[in-house]
Amino acid sequence: MRNWRWLLLVLAVLLAWLQYRFWFGPGNSGEVMMLEAQVAHQTQDNEGLRQRNQALAAEVKDLKDGEAAIEERARSELGMIKPGETFYRVVEDAPLPAPASAEASAPAQQAPEPVDPVDHP
């Protein structure tokens, strides 16, 4: 009977020691959770960089293979045109400022200016 008590005591101490190492020792559960979060964050970063690399690789391939991409870039970034083409720049008018009150939005009636019938040299 006494042997059982010693065995039970040894098992309880062993369990307590293992629990202490699990919660507070090196490689404890808090560190594991922190490392898992870092791995998830790094995985997201890697996926974004992988997509960026694929887009850059596609752009490089297009620039190497296709003349259309080179032409589009020369037109948009360098302002180049083909021989015989005419370049037109469309400039939009700036919007008029909104009137300050409702009275200002009503059309003002002005008398026409008198016409001078005398011919000036």
Swiss-Prot record:
Pfam families named among the record's database cross-references: DivIC
Compositional bias per record (Low complexity), positions renumbered to this chain: 99-113
InterPro entries xrefs: Cell_div_FtsB, FtsL/DivIC
Subcellular location: Cell inner membrane
Cytoplasmic topological intervals: 1-6
Segments in the Periplasmic topological domain: 25-121
A single BP term in Gene Ontology: FtsZ-dependent cytokinesis
Key words of the record: Cell cycle, Cell division, Cell inner membrane, Cell membrane, Coiled coil, Membrane, Transmembrane, Transmembrane helix
Residue ranges of the region described as Disordered: 98-121
Membrane topology reported for the UniProt record: Single-pass type II membrane protein
One Gene Ontology cellular component annotation held by this UniProt entry: plasma membrane
Transmembrane segments: 7-24
Chief location of this protein within or outside the cell: membrane
Coiled-coil annotated residue ranges, if any: 31-66
Family: Belongs to the FtsB family.
PANTHER family (alphabetical): CELL DIVISION PROTEIN FTSB
Function: Essential cell division protein. May link together the upstream cell division proteins, which are predominantly cytoplasmic, with the downstream cell division proteins, which are predominantly periplasmic.
Subunit structure: Part of a complex composed of FtsB, FtsL and FtsQ.
UniProt name for this protein: Cell division protein FtsB
Organism: Xanthomonas axonopodis pv. citri (strain 306)
Biological classification of the source: Bacteria, Pseudomonadati, Pseudomonadota, Gammaproteobacteria, Lysobacterales
Gene: ftsB
